[in-house]
From Swiss-Prot:
Consists of three domains; the N-terminal catalytic domain, the editing domain and the C-terminal C-Ala domain. The editing domain removes incorrectly charged amino acids, while the C-Ala domain, along with tRNA(Ala), serves as a bridge to cooperatively bring together the editing and aminoacylation centers thus stimulating deacylation of misacylated tRNAs. Binds 1 zinc ion per subunit. SUPFAM superfamilies: Class II aaRS and biotin synthetases, Putative anticodon-binding domain of alanyl-tRNA synthetase (AlaRS), ThrRS/AlaRS common domain, Translation proteins. GO terms for molecular function: alanine-tRNA ligase activity; aminoacyl-tRNA deacylase activity; ATP binding; catalytic activity, acting on a protein; transferase activity; tRNA binding; zinc ion binding. This is Alanine--tRNA ligase. NCBIfam families: alaS (TIGR00344). Its main location: cytoplasm. GO terms for cellular component: cytosol. Pfam families: DHHA1 (PF02272), tRNA-synt_2c (PF01411), tRNA_SAD (PF07973). The lineage of its organism: Bacteria, Bacillati, Bacillota, Clostridia, Eubacteriales. The keyword RNA-binding applies. It comes from Clostridium perfringens (strain 13 / Type A). The keyword ATP-binding applies. GO terms for biological process: alanyl-tRNA aminoacylation.
Amino acid sequence: MKFMGANELREKYLSFFESKDHLRLQSFPLVPKNDKSLLLINAGMAPLKPYFTGLEEPPKRRITTCQKCIRTGDIENVGKTSRHGTFFEMLGNFSFGDYFKSEIIPWAWEFITETLGIPKDKLYVTIYLNDDEAYDIWTSKTDVDPSRIFRLGKDDNFWEIGVGPCGPCTEIHFDRGEGKVETVEEFLEASDADRIVEFWNLVFTQFDKDEEGNYNELAQKNIDTGMGLERIATIMQGVDNIFEIDTVKNILNKACELTNAKYGEDKDKDVSLRIITDHGKSVTFLICDGVQPSNEGRGYVLRRLLRRAARHGRLLGVKGIFLNEMVDAVVENYGEAYPELREKADYIKKIIKLEEERFNETIDSGMDILMSYISEMEEKNEKVLSGAKAFKLYDTYGFPLELTQEILEEKGLELDIENFNKEMKEQRERARNARGESSYMGSEESPVNKVDASIVTEFDGYVNLELNSKVIVLGNNEEFKAELKEGEEGFLLTDKTPFYAEMGGQVGDRGNITSETGMAIVTDCKKNVGGKFVHYIKVIEGSLKEGQEVKLSVDASRRSNICKNHTATHMLHEALKEVLGDHVNQSGSYVDEERLRFDFTHFAALTEEELEKVELLVNEKIMTVSVVDTKEMSLDEARNSGATCLFDEKYAEKVRVVSVGDFSKELCGGTHVANSGEIGLFKIVSESGVAAGIRRIEAVTGISALKFMELKNNMLKEAASMLKCNEKDIAKRIAAQAHELKEKDKEIAELKAKLVQGAEDDILKDKVEINGVELVTAELKDVDGNSLRDLADKVRNKLNNGIVVLASDNGGKVNLVAMATKNSLANGVHCGKVIKEVAAVVGGGGGGRPDMAQAGGKNPENIAKALEKAKEVVELLVK
């Protein structure tokens, strides 16, 4: 067989099926759209589910893709074996009611044996036990040797998930060994031994399984095939694992270079290198597709992968930041197939760098605490770390659970995961109760998401805010209805509408719908999971009926304000690029009638000067009264024209480009003003950080901007009145008063210090002796941590062989400190152990060295009991 690189294989597959009249689609982003059942795209057919289920019409009945996928179900095995990985590419060709078995089987054989040139005596085929149709096609339409076809049962060659569409499948296998297997038993044995590997699965979706377990023929039969690019690459390159194929090996070589480690010399180092290689690739693609590190959902998947790779870098001796340098190798090997990687390379590097820096801070503090837990366990001969301690590491210090488990496993220890999960559940319930429960009509089981896929609503609301239409669907959260009566709430679909459905960060329109028999207010307009325009309504008079003519009217004033804010968002985006740099990209947005919110990539808080420049630039462009122009064109034309595309969006072949004069040009389906002058005024309200490398600006326009400025002006007047000065002198007056307060605070601190300095002799009067060791305890009032340490140090210097424990109620918070003379340590004194027990009594925690420790607490009323506890602990230590 001729060697073929992974990039060549990808192109050959897609080109082959294009020659069979398939539409080639670019890979969908890893973040699923309108699919709450998936955290990340994990299969080639996953983003095409709406086409298979009939919720949406496919752009063509024949489609071929190479889909980016992430699977983390067996992440613990990644690195430990050379077969497991989290990122992979799935080659697929799909038919939605077009061709079926008699076409795909000979095509598959043609591609494998002719295009790829795989020897026929290295191939085996499996079919479902009683799929005679597939057997007949294999033996009549291809030249496969019939003795190389094996019939297998449901577990191997039938695809189904509960009830619904399902069907048999045929799989194609490659034999890495010598000689021919003759029986099913020999075939299965060779497969279990990894001598024979499956590399292409052709699923024939031809049945609908009902609740009783009956298999009924589908009217529309579909084809869903999947071939892992990495798997076929191992075959075509004559290697036996994914880390040896050309693209992945190049990334592995980069990992070796960055860690100064050599692959293949040390088993443990190989594990770390494979983890860095795989996870480095996955995090690059995840960030490119818009995922941000966080503590939940797909953001946590990203954080977990990144931190696991970072830790294995440390195990290889890496000091500091290095994972961001892996991006170059990923871009070099995948950039041609996924050009968005090249466009976002610098941004991806910065996000990884920020997250790795944060992790290095986390791991240092968390590791110290975890190792202290492990030391305690070893002293007590315990094998299981408590769930409460692991949860404290996770919740308080941000130390990943998986990292705790991995380190414990390396030490031969276990984690009480059941109690960890219990702690996690309790915390989530507390959070849920704190924010309150909320719901919105439109769950995936609701009738609103079961509307027939053939129903189409024409949107005609860019110019028209009022039009006549026909009701084609009515319903509520329980069922479809022929009529909705006064007082009832529900949803309504029409054949055309002027109502904009919530999308692209812009809220849906509101307004009213009238007919001969009644009137309803439209409270919102959204798209259901199938992309249909859904008007959420409340009938306020009479009734609305299915099939009747209605008049739809959008709230024009509200729409006008939304348009102002949406166009201003585009202008803000461009202004940020000009002021901060081209690395700025939209990360999210929200536009309603009152305000706009814009999230964007940037790595530091904006200075006042930068904010002023951005705001001024937007207002200057507003005052040019530039025409806002919209044009439809192909995606390639839009990109070539310089239009801004959002890198986590999946665009159709035809797109809408919105231009504000020669200042801003973006792909957008939203509603906008006719010219920039309609916006009137733009005012930034706030700027803040929302995640690593993501900033947020909130702003107002038009009348809302005037009201905001009026509010600010009134606040200035009120402040001037309180300070008894002119508005222009407010800053000077506040600065003077702040200086005066600072001087007074300094005087108070000096007085407190003098009081403390003379206190050591009084404190020593209460000294007691325990088995030859002196113990001094004292409770003080309003002494800060620094002064308390100074006092403890002075008392310690007056002891011959002893320990001092001091506690202070400082404004409702407890400060604790313990110090011991060096010779007392030989008698068993350990300040860290003492302070840990003492702190628990006042509702706090802490620790430290044998000769010095400190802690805090929140229950000052228990200080006396805490100092009694100090005496008990010292008595135990110096027996």
